Amino acid sequence: NHESELRSDGYLFMKIINRAIEIKNNVNNEIKLGSLDIQRDWSYAGDVMKAAKLIIESDNGEDYVIGSGKPTSIKSLVEFVFRYFDLDYLNYFQEDKNLLRPNEPKIKYSSPKKIKEDFGWETKLTVNDILEKCIEQKLLEFNT
């Protein structure tokens, strides 16, 4: 999965951030998500585009997997965002079984070994870096 501060509100990162801001401002008092145990590989869209550019410009016809190669749980995302706003997510989180996808694999992440070996490429921003960029953007939007 790729993320950036330009994502629309329907995506997970922005949903978590929006709820935390709303809770901090007493506009909302809960965040409903599916399982917090789901783990995914999230990379910054800018890093992904740099990788795509390298692949296209190489003209070698090879297939490459682009990603961080690191699974991160939804729980980790929620904890980071809520901690950023000095909130304890446990006071606001509600698991909603209706948000669970059937047959969803619990852990899903990439193996970017080949692109690193061939081009020296790897993601520059961590998941927390991406979350901070997204939070900063949302705070700008809320304050304008």
Regions found by a protein language model. Give the residues of each.
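Conserved catalytic-site region of short-chain dehydrogenase/reductase
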Residues: 1-6
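C-terminal substrate-binding subdomain of Rossmann-fold SDR/epimerase-dehydratase oxidoreductases
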Residues: 12-144
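Active-site loop immediately N-terminal to the catalytic Tyr-X3-Lys motif
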Residues: 9
